[in-house]
Amino acid sequence: MHRLFHPESIAIVGASTKENKFGGTSFLIRFQDAGYTGRLYPINPQADTIRGLQAYPDLKALPEVPDLAIVCVAAPFVPAVLQTCGEIGLTRVHILTSGFRELGTPEGDALEAEVKRLADQFGLLIVGPNCMGPYCPASGLTAWGAIPGKPGPIGIISQSGGITQRLTEYLFSLGIGVEKAVSMGNATVLNANDFLQDMAEDPKIRVIAMYLENAGDGRVFFSRVREIGRRKPIVILKGGVFAAGARTIVSHTGSMAGSLQIWEAFSRQTGAIRVRSMEEWADTTIALSLLPAPSGNGVFLATGGGGNSVINSDIFQHEGLDVPELSPESMQQLRQRIPVIGSIAGNPLDSFEIFFNPRHMADITQIVASDPAIAMLVIDRLIQRKAFHIMDTTDLTEKTIEILQPVSRLKPTVVTVESDGGDLELGQKGITMRRRFCESGIPAYPTTERAARALAHLTAYHAYKRDHPL
């Protein structure tokens, strides 16, 4: 499996001289733009050169057996390419082409059955068909996804190329890298179970994020997730749990979906974190990849304004987290430091001073982080609307990071940067702030609801681990 993600040579079967045509040539262009340092072999019997590279009529004409073949020819011609791969000993194959089982036709079913037969005959490790294939920034295998993409602590397994690409690009926009990802499409040969095992054994991956439409062999998948989940968190976005989505799955990857009740039971019994949206998938993956295990479910909230304090408390308690009272010792220390006017000491903490006075923030976080009732901290980095003529909090981002980093290593600490409201300038400031926090190892979320849901998943996963030790 290593060479699948770290190929030193790639043959692109079906590369074209037409650069505006999606398929082999678009992959070739991306490899060149991303600075892939391995050897690239475009295969096209009608061309002498493609994008400055010598073209070859077929795989047998190559000067070496490449580590990976990317197959981009029309579906009826794919079996012949696989036959050649087997004959020359090329065992790692990514089939980009669609037109197989997902069509729901006898012809598509027959073609996919032939792909499976040839894989069994020659021992081919096939990703696909009908997929974008493997992605690995460390090796330059970035024909899709974020470019340039830096490696990071996350592995992604998905049956959708578009969804996988969206997640890699969103994570990269926050300065968070991906170690490896795979879009596996119909998963005819290599499936979720195979990639789960590979990523479980990769020491660079801390969290595995999955988008699934079908789990393949359910018993094997259940066993593997339950075993791996006690070592690494697995975040699953399951498509097609309701009727309309399930109908779409059949034409997308030719899979059959399971019911919502089945997946809820699966999550309870395996410790897998089941999420319901792209945003929740990304938010939870970020929290699990950056934060330590919380000791409990008690959350300290630092916010500004009495109404915000009330609403935020409700949001976190709705997610099953606690907003506990602080100890008498903590309360005494807070009262000595909280301004009398416009502030309320306690949990939540209502103090605008924390937005603009780094020393005040440092004192407060040190006090509450020492309180045994507090397992996690949430700091609101409100971007002040254009009122009150108060200094811009974005100027304090680096100082805030300096204060929160040592706290976050002891107790999970996140920030919320709510910059909506339709103001483009404030929106851009919010994006910039969230990126800097995430780059520094502190998850940052655009809403309190998203922060609460991510911390609820973090807490539930580590509670499961404590209850199910290795």
Regions found by a protein language model. Give the residues of each.
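Catalytic-core regions of core metabolic enzymes
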Residues: 1-470
